[in-house]
Every structure is written in structure tokens, then in C-alpha cells.
């Protein structure tokens, strides 16, 4: 089972499950925990190969797709007897949340999609294919640093960029390559998500400087009736770290509005 931690305020409060992105860990939510615990029970999960989810079992697994990763998260919920939860995700974690909800809509109360990845633009696709071709030649941290700079290029993004680089150093190289290959092949799944409304209350929280992903999210929100968009000014990709107070306020307000059926 994946490594996880729970923060239970009251048994009758709804749950919020946080899902980090590739190369991160549950520690990236340190600016959210105090605020969310006031109104919710909180579950933090380390995805396979990340944080403390590094048992040899995960190293040996050949099968690597978003459904398998989602099932591992659901295994934690089942273990804790959590029937329904709100989800909060960042970056590639939003793909996992959306995939879980697609197959198990009855488990989801609502979704907060921070720095959501729902389409790789042409530049992103070229970069991912180039990286996939070079991943067996270059040290994985060289690739990770490169992509961190591409996605978070400004000086104001340095805290988030440095945190993700620091967390990525803790990954096994084989694990990084598996995730990289997974992301390089994700476009068909993302296309399905863009053209199919989840019919679950969804709030996208994006930075105005998230040049690679914000344009596609604007189009999705215009098309999906269940989705809303909150753009944080002067903010990059990792919104929960760069502008935590704005992120927390917007997310908590939205979650409270959709907690009646918890």
C-alpha cells in the first residue's frame, strides 16, 4: 500500500485527499495543511516511487498507467473506509484525480485542480518526445531540471521550482523514467478528458503565468458546465506554493459549497 498520513479533526467532517505531481511528494502541501484541517479531515498520499512509497514491490512493477496509479490511491481510501472525498491535486496529480473520478464518480464530492495538466501544447509535446528519447542517455536530474525551468521559468517561481527539484532527487532513476514515459504517452487520455465533462463540481486554480497549460484550461471551462476557473495573478504553475493564501481561500470556499452530500 502507498504511504499516507491522515489528519482527522472530527469524524463527521468531509474528507479532502491531496494528490501531488510527478517528482513531488505529500510534503508539497505544507502550506495547505493548517488551513484545510480547520474544516476537513485531510488525507495526504505519496504516489508510487515518491516520498515514503518506495517499497521494493513498487520497483518491480512492470504495469505503469494512470488507472493502476489511481487504483493504488483508492486502495488507501478503502483501507481507511473513506467512501467519498474531495480531491485536491497539483500538476500531474490532476490527471490522476480526473482518471479516478472518471471510473469512480461516486467516490468524488468535488475536485480542485491546481496547475492542471489537461493538454500538452505543441512545444510541450516536442519537449516530452525529446526527453523520452534522451532519458536513457542523460542523467534524470538533468532532464528534470530542464523541464522545471521550462514550466517555471521566472524568478518568482524559484521556490516552487527548487522544491520540486529537491523532491525529485529522492526518486529512483528507474522510477523517474517510468513516469516520464507515462507522461509522454498521455495525450489520448487528456483529449478524452477535454471532450468529456466529468459532471462533478470542479474548480481549476491556475496561475496567470502558467503559459504552457492555462490556455487549454480556459477552453475546457468554457465547454464543461461543471467546471469553474480561478486565475491567480502574477503566479506560475505551482499555485499552492507560490500563492498559498489565495489558493487556500478559493479552494476551501469551493469545497464547503459542495460538502452537503459528504
Tell me what each language-model feature is.
Residues 1-17, 38-41, 78, 83, ...:
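Alpha/beta-hydrolase fold catalytic core
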Amino acid at each position: 500500500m502507498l504511504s499516507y498520513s491522515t489528519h482527522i479533526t472530527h469524524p463527521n467532517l468531509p474528507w479532502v485527499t491531496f494528490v501531488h505531481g510527478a517528482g513531488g511528494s505529500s510534503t508539497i502541501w505544507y502550506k495547505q495543511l493548517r488551513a484545510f484541517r480547520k474544516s476537513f479531515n485531510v488525507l495526504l498520499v505519496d504516489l508510487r516511487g515518491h516520498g515514503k512509497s518506495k517499497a521494493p514491490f513498487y520497483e518491480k512493477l512492470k504495469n505503469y498507467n494512470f488507472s493502476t496509479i489511481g487504483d493504488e490511491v483508492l486502495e488507501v481510501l478503502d483501507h481507511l473506509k473513506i467512501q467519498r472525498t474531495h480531491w485536491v491535486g497539483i500538476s500531474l496529480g490532476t490527471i490522476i484525480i480526473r482518471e479516478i473520478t472518471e471510473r469512480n464518480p461516486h467516490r468524488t464530492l468535488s475536485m480542485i485542480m491546481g496547475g492542471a495538466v489537461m493538454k500538452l501544447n505543441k512545444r510541450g509535446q516536442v519537449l516530452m518526445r525529446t526527453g523520452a528519447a534522451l532519458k536513457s542517455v542523460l542523467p534524470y536530474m538533468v532532464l528534470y531540471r530542464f523541464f522545471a525551468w521550462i514550466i517555471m521559468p521566472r524568478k518568482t517561481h524559484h521556490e516552487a521550482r527548487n522544491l520540486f527539484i529537491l523532491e525529485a532527487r529522492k526518486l529512483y532513476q528507474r522510477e523517474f523514467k517510468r513516469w516520464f514515459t507515462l507522461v509522454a504517452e498521455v495525450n489520448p487520455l487528456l483529449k478524452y478528458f477535454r471532450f468529456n465533462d466529468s459532471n462533478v463540481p470542479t474548480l481549476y486554480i491556475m496561475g496567470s503565468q502558467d503559459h504552457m497549460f492555462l490556455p487549454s484550461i480556459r477552453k475546457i471551462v468554457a465547454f464543461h458546465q461543471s467546471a469553474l476557473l480561478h486565475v491567480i495573478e502574477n503566479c506560475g504553475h505551482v499555485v499552492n506554493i507560490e500563492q498559498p493564501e489565495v489558493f487556500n481561500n478559493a479552494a476551501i470556499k469551493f469545497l464547503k459549497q459542495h460538502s452537503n452530500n459528504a
